[in-house]
């Protein structure tokens, strides 16, 4: 094992520990809320900039609308997370939630490493590094990346009408 493998293991362990303490339902709801928030933001951000009538500069007006939306979004997310915590405590599924959260964290850590590795290979000469070539985990990550890219290419590029 070399440096890349050690970093990979550390990232996966940190992700698993964080997800263990947060729990599966909170992790899942967090991802769902972030996706919905980003979609709503890109669809309606111009609507929020209308409320900034005191600012004449369009760029500054958009920045203010981004900040206002982000603050409201974080407020809504914290309320939703609190409701999920209460639900978990009332149902008594805390241990199962934490165990599934740990597995979710492992998967999230592997996906994060695959994304980072993909962009390192795409944008840099990192693939020619001796640590990269001698890594134990990199071939497995690359295999997963190739499967995902092949699937996405077939699904969204070749059959797009």
Curated annotation (Swiss-Prot):
Family: To E.coli CvpA.
Name recorded for this polypeptide: Colicin V production protein homolog
GO annotations of cellular component type: plasma membrane
Record-annotated membrane-spanning stretches: 7-26, 31-53, 66-88, 101-123, 136-153
UniProt topology in membrane: Multi-pass membrane protein
Keywords: Cell membrane, Membrane, Transmembrane, Transmembrane helix
A biological process from GO: toxin biosynthetic process
Compartments (UniProt record): Cell membrane
Organism name: Buchnera aphidicola subsp. Baizongia pistaciae (strain Bp)
Keyword Transmembrane: yes
Pfam families cross-referenced by the UniProt entry: Colicin_V
Classification via InterPro entries: Colicin-V_CvpA, CvpA-like
């Amino acid at each position: 094992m070399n440096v890349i493998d050690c970093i990979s293991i550390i990232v996966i362990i940190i992700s698993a520990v964080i997800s263990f303490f947060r729990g599966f339902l909170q992790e899942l709801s967090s991802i769902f809320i972030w996706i919905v928030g980003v979609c709503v933001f890109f669809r309606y951000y111009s609507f929020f900039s209308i409320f900034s009538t005191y600012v004449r500069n369009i760029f500054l007006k958009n920045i203010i609308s981004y900040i206002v939306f982000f603050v409201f979004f974080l407020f809504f997310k914290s309320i939703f997370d609190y409701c999920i915590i209460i639900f978990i405590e009332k149902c008594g599924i805390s241990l199962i939630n934490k165990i599934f959260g740990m597995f979710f964290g492992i998967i999230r850590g592997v996906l994060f490493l695959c994304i980072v590795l993909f962009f390192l290979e795409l944008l840099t000469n990192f693939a020619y590094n001796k640590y990269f070539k001698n890594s134990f985990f990199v071939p497995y990550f690359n295999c997963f990346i190739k499967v995902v890219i092949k699937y996405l290419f077939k699904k969204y590029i070749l059959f797009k009408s």
